[in-house]
């Protein structure tokens, strides 16, 4: 410590020499001879600290606390200044918009769209059939009879159904009536049960009537000719 005190004291002769030359030596700012003396003084002080371990520990702790205080105070002052000026949000930057975020989830592309293969078949709610996705709309239109062509087809089907039901009812009534009147023809019609067979029966009856009429006409002609 005595060495430090001796090194930091300035003799009057030195001050007088500096004043005579028109220069004033300030520690750390001197030039020429004064700067060299300041450097020597710092080196001497550093060597004095290294000789005593206790002084070295104190110096290191002091330096560490000083650095921590300066760094912390600088951060606090800067944050306070940004808060007061309204520029605190500039530290984080602009927030990224959700529309431009890149998706990194599995089975999804960078835009968040699923990359899994979608089923190409659809189930019809009316007939429970599997239909291709490209043909689902026209199939549903036809299946439910919503379009123009589909409505025409549906009306035709309805008309044919009504016609077949009416023809079947008329044929059944005819078979019942024929069975009540006479045995052979009605029984034969009941055995067949179709309109075509009924038409054949009518044609056979007409043929029988024509044959009887022709035989009568032939007999009358023979009588007129008096051929006995």
UniProtKB/Swiss-Prot annotation:
UniProt modified residues of type Phosphoserine: 204
Major localization listed first in the record, in broad terms: nucleus
Recorded family membership: Belongs to the SGF11 family.
UniProt keywords, alphabetically: Activator, Chromatin regulator, Cytoplasm, Metal-binding, mRNA transport, Nucleus, Phosphoprotein, Protein transport, Transcription, Transcription regulation, Translocation, Transport, Zinc, Zinc-finger
Biased composition (Gly residues): 180-193
Lineage: Eukaryota, Metazoa, Ecdysozoa, Arthropoda, Hexapoda
Short name of one Pfam family: Sgf11
UniProt key word Cell inner membrane: no
Ranges for region Disordered: 1-34, 154-228
Leader peptide range in chain numbering: none
GO molecular function, one term: transcription coactivator activity
Zinc finger (SGF11-type): 122-143
Protein name as catalogued: SAGA-associated factor 11 homolog 2
Biased composition (Low complexity): 1-11, 19-34, 214-228
Quaternary structure note: Component of some SAGA transcription coactivator-HAT complexes, at least composed of Ada2b, not/nonstop, Pcaf/Gcn5, Sgf11 and Spt3. Within the SAGA complex, Sgf11, e(y)2, and not/nonstop form an additional subcomplex of SAGA called the DUB module (deubiquitination module). Interacts directly with not/nonstop. Interacts with the AMEX complex component xmas-2. Interacts with Cbp80; important for promoter recruitment of Sgf11 that is not associated with the DUB module.
Subcellular localization: Nucleus, Nucleoplasm; Cytoplasm
Originating gene: Sgf11-2
Functional summary from the UniProt entry: Component of the transcription regulatory histone acetylation (HAT) complex SAGA, a multiprotein complex that activates transcription by remodeling chromatin and mediating histone acetylation and deubiquitination. Within the SAGA complex, participates in a subcomplex that specifically deubiquitinates histone H2B. The SAGA complex is recruited to specific gene promoters by activators, where it is required for transcription. Required for nuclear receptor-mediated transactivation. Binds independently on SAGA to promoters in an RNA-dependent manner.
GO cellular component, one term: nuclear pore
Biological-process GO terms, alphabetical: chromatin organization; mRNA export from nucleus; positive regulation of DNA-templated transcription; protein transport; regulation of transcription by RNA polymerase II
Disulfide bond annotation, renumbered to this chain: none
């Amino acid at each position: 410590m005595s060495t430090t005190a001796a090194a930091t004291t300035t003799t009057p002769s030195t001050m007088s020499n500096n004043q005579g030359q028109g220069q004033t030596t300030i520690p750390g700012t001197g030039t020429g001879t004064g700067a060299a003396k300041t450097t020597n003084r710092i080196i001497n002080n550093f060597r004095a600290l290294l000789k005593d371990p206790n002084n070295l520990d104190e110096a290191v702790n002091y330096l560490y606390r000083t650095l921590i205080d300066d760094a912390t105070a600088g951060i606090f002052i800067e944050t306070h200044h940004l808060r007061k000026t309204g520029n605190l949000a500039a530290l984080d930057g602009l927030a990224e918009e959700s529309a431009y975020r890149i998706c990194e989830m599995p089975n999804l592309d960078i835009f968040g769209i699923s990359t899994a293969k979608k089923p190409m078949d659809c189930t019809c709610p009316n007939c429970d059939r599997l239909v291709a996705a490209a043909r689902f709309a026209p199939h549903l239109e036809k299946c439910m009879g919503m379009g123009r062509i589909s409505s025409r087809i549906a009306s035709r089907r309805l008309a044919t159904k009504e016609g077949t039901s009416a023809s079947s009812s008329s044929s059944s009534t005819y078979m019942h009536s024929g069975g009540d009147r006479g045995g052979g023809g009605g029984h034969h019609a009941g055995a067949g049960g179709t309109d075509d067979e009924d038409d054949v029966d009518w044609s056979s009856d007409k043929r029988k009537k024509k044959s009887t009429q022709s035989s009568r006409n032939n007999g009358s002609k023979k009588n007129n000719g008096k051929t006995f």
